[in-house]
């Protein structure tokens, strides 16, 4: 059975559920986590996370949960600023290294844009450029819906 995110933001596993991605309020002002969705409805960051094996998914989602709690105060080794308001979630499991890129928007909201398996020392410029394109699209669609 393939593990999937359900409509509540849970990744459902045979043995347990992990839910750091749900929308809601808590006693502490937490950041809302959203996946960027392209015009065709696809969600690159969600699709990337779901493509990972269960253990790496769990590590990525734990870091997303930390981001939800800490927002822009989350720093290395969990998060790092890259360029022009684009940040990365940093996850390592064994020899595998993954990154999920994101940006902040007004209203304590984090938008996860895209992810990749890191194979070089430096984050590929193409991934940062893609995150910037997704951010521009997100903000343009947000503005046009007002």
Task: Give the location of each predicted region.
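Basic, Lys/Arg-enriched alpha-helical interface segments
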Residues: 1-97, 106-110, 119-146
